[in-house]
């Protein structure tokens, strides 16, 4: 986040997957094996006040870097999403939706003392109440079989094919980011991810013809991002990504997922001081 103030640019859309503050020493299951839920020191809670201050600080920076008609998406669970929503409201954002991402393949609850955690939340907000944000309503209706898309999305968690260059502990699935990008941006729009991780947002942006800037502090994940970006130079892999994304779109307008040469770009150039 230290770099963000030095970026002399405003983005059409921001997707943020900030720390959830859920690394508490617990265990979960992945591929049939017990694993720790700890993601790293960056995901450990520093206490309510410090966690809340952190969310407010980065959300304030992001609001400065958002175009007047741009929108921001922020993912989370009950561990952090209420703090994010409060900070958004206090900073002047207008929350449009709280998307419930229902995973159809969640890990089981090992303790058997409460309901299985199978959802995450994604807040979608515009810069202010008076902003005229972009929403591709017709496309969302089309990929939902001709009916209005609701705010509960049933999509799988990260699949094996998305781990070809390694696995980030909180990596988001490509179909999820693709839907978000298609819903709220146009081709050649600029997208920012201030917690880029392994750059699923960047991969989806590239595949769908958008411009992207990602910020990430961990060298390991930067290398993973570069490897994933390099993969896209293989036209067969890029075509495979389109096909996999299209499986989650019940539509006859499949040309939105066809591999094609990018349109000439005559838009804004990004500057980093």
What do these predicted ranges mean?
Residues 1-5, 226-267:
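S-adenosyl-L-methionine
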